[in-house]
């Protein structure tokens, strides 16, 4: 449930931030107002790219604000690498705890099957103890077998549906992160007056 809320918040906040990013031609003013945005994947990617660009700018001999000199291709590659690392970190954070759900999807049917086999063995044991194949001898084992099968399915089916829905949301946000990283680097490389207030 918490993963669903996390992804819903991330998706909504991502769309809001993306709209602001596209409307705002000035990174510095966007960074000044970053506090109004939730701490979501795109905001974290932006912060990483922005801070890397500022480091490169401060290390450069050129004054970007006064003579509108853009980044060199090697500087852009450094920014792109920082943004790509941030995208990977955010993807890992989004996928956190999904392994637990995947394990439930995979393991529950097998636990149900184990219970079924155990119940059938119990039914045969009941037949052997009573010396007959009467319903009263096999019913407890069969009912136990069916119960564990039902429990396994009750766990597996909702887990599978939840896993698939959450995975779909994660893929959607991951695509947005990849697209944003390209858009961010492209915007920096195409706008020489990007840093002016």
Predicted regions and their residues:
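Hydrophobic alpha-helical membrane-embedded segments
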Residues: 1-6
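Hydrophobic positions within alpha-helical transmembrane segments of bacterial inner-membrane proteins
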Residues: 109-120, 149, 153-161
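Hydrophobic aliphatic residue packing
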Residues: 117-120, 138, 142, 155, ...
């Amino acid at each position: 449930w918490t993963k669903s809320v996390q992804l819903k918040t991330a998706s909504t906040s991502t769309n809001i931030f993306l709209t602001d990013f596209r409307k705002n031609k000035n990174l510095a003013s966007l960074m000044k107002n970053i506090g109004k945005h939730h701490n979501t994947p795109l905001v974290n990617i932006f912060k990483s790219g922005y801070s890397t660009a500022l480091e490169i700018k401060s290390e450069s001999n050129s004054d970007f604000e006064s003579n509108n000199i853009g980044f060199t291709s090697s500087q852009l590659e450094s920014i792109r690498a920082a943004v790509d690392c941030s995208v990977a970190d955010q993807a890992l954070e989004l996928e956190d705890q999904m392994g637990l759900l995947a394990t439930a999807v995979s393991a529950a049917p097998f636990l149900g099957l184990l219970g079924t086999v155990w119940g059938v063995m119990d039914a045969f044991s009941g037949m052997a103890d009573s010396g007959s194949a009467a319903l009263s001898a096999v019913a407890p084992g069969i009912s136990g077998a069916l119960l564990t099968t039902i429990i396994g399915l009750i766990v597996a089916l909702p887990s599978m549906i939840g896993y698939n829905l959450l995975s779909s949301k994660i893929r959607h946000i991951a695509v947005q992160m990849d697209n944003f990283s390209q858009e961010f680097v492209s915007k920096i490389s195409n706008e020489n007056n990007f840093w002016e207030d």
